[in-house]
Swiss-Prot record:
NCBIfam families in the record: ksgA
Natural source organism: Prosthecochloris aestuarii (strain DSM 271 / SK 413)
GO cellular component annotations of the record: cytosol
HAMAP family: 16SrRNA_methyltr_A
One Pfam family it belongs to: RrnaAD
Presence of the UniProt keyword Cytoplasm in the record: yes
GO molecular function: 16S rRNA (adenine(1518)-N(6)/adenine(1519)-N(6))-dimethyltransferase activity; RNA binding
Function: Specifically dimethylates two adjacent adenosines (A1518 and A1519) in the loop of a conserved hairpin near the 3'-end of 16S rRNA in the 30S particle. May play a critical role in biogenesis of 30S subunits.
Name of the protein this chain belongs to: Ribosomal RNA small subunit methyltransferase A
PROSITE patterns recorded: RRNA_A_DIMETH, SAM_RNA_A_N6_MT
Length: 261
């Protein structure tokens, strides 16, 4: 069992919580700068751990909220950083409307590899309460999130997130700056929610995207014909694969199909 100790607190690292603690001050500084936070901003940090990012945020924002699931780490943050509003909870269960009672929030954090996608979709569903997200995640996931059409990384995650948010890959973070050292590299991504006409039909659009990509090597026609009336789509569109369509094209396709009854 791997253990990590900092000051007076020692924890047994929980793989299921994705506990890899950032130690490099330069990387921490770059993350805070990338988040573009200002004094008075409402900041929410996901998984503060031993407070490496927490202390850097406090240099800009004298008070903010952090969400930590691990009880020992939550106690550590309360003791070391009393000005931080510590919410001891699973981020997937947090009420973002409550976190944003005083105004929309800027989300930051080194998010666990094991639940990256659920966290991203939790944030997506609560984007009306969010100004921006500056997140460190597994490098491979970051590439998928910011991928362009026609690449092997481009898929459901990219289309669903990029439709409702502006997504930017910022920089890579090597595994050597963590304790314990993970098996893969990380990267920092910035996500900014945007207004779109699809806000009112998000659930059905996301279902459409999942079905379009359900078998990547099949054509759009083969993936959709059992689920939608696709008679308004052209023959050339139907013979293309989902990975070839841009975000704008996906939006146009969605406006011209109808679910089969």
């Amino acid at each position: 069992m791997t253990k990590v100790q900092y000051k007076h607190t020692e924890i047994a690292v929980k793989k299921k919580l994705g506990q890899n603690f950032l130690t490099d001050r330069n990387t921490i500084r770059k993350i805070v700068q990338s988040a573009e936070i200002q004094p008075g901003d409402h900041v929410v940090e996901i998984g503060p751990g031993f407070g490496a990012l927490t202390s850097a945020i406090l240099e800009v924002c004298p008070s903010f909220t952090a969400v930590e699931k691990d009880r020992k780490l939550a106690d550590f943050i309360r003791e070391e950083y009393p000005s931080v509003n510590l919410v001891e909870s699973d981020i997937l269960e947090v009420d973002f409307a409550k976190l944003a009672e005083e105004g929309p929030v800027k989300v930051m954090g080194n998010i666990p590899y094991s639940i990256t996608s659920p966290i991203l979709f939790k944030l997506l569903e609560n984007r009306s309460h969010i100004i921006s997200e500056t997140l460190m995640m597994q490098h491979e996931v970051a590439l998928r999130l910011a991928a362009n059409p026609g690449t092997k990384e481009y898929g459901i995650l990219a289309v669903q997130l990029q439709t409702f948010c502006d997504v930017r890959y910022l920089f890579k973070v090597g595994k050597k700056v963590f304790r314990p050292r993970p098996e893969v590299d990380s990267a920092v991504v910035r996500i900014v929610p945007k207004k779109t006409p699809l806000d009112d039909c998000e659930t059905e659009f996301r279902r459409f995207v999942r079905l379009a990509f359900q078998q990547r090597r099949k054509t759009l026609q083969n993936n959709l014909k059992q689920h939608y009336d696709i008679s308004q789509l052209s023959a050339s569109e139907l013979q293309r694969r989902a990975e070839s369509f841009t975000i704008t094209e996906f939006e146009m396709l969605f406006s011209r199909i109808r679910p089969l009854q």
